[in-house]
A protein has these predicted regions:
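Chalcogenol-based redox active-site neighborhoods
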Residues: 1-145
């Protein structure tokens, strides 16, 4: 499945957070949602990305819900979140179901399947923006989308 484009309907999903609660996309309609997919907790690139979202959280807070999604399990997510004092929730997608629905679970350059680092801005159930995973690039897109 290709990566979802702007204007596409965002697939509804329910996933568990690093704290064991469940989050359902369709229940988050009160403000936009920034949903960023990343490959793996506590790896160099993913740690940088998550810390950028952490550091930009005050800019996002009033404007959007922010969630990171990776295949890591809840215990790994919780340890990663605690280690870096992440101030947003991490969602666990161990079977890559949601990543596949959004089109970000695909073959990579090395010939193996994995997550293509992608951030979506979702407004009223639609993809309002799609950006690279860097927090400072995404934040401006919330107002624009």
């Amino acid at each position: 499945m290709p990566i979802l484009s702007e204007g596409a309907t965002a697939p509804d999903f329910t996933l568990q957070t690093d704290q064991g609660a469940t989050v359902t996309l369709s229940a988050l309609q009160d403000k936009p949602l920034v949903l960023f997919f990343y490959p793996k907790d506590d790896t160099p690139g993913c740690t940088i990305e998550c810390k950028e979202f952490r550091d930009a959280r005050s800019e996002f807070e009033a404007k959007a819900h922010v969630f990171g999604i990776s295949p890591d399990d809840l215990a790994i997510h919780q340890a990663f979140r605690d280690k870096y004092a992440l101030n947003f929730r991490l969602l666990s997608d161990p079977e890559h179901r949601v990543a596949s629905q959004f089109g970000v679970w695909a073959l990579k350059k090395n010939g193996m399947e994995g997550i293509h680092r992608t951030t979506f801005v979702i407004r009223a159930g639609k993809i309002a923006g799609r950006r690279g995973g860097r927090a400072h690039l995404v934040n401006g897109g919330i107002a624009e989308s």
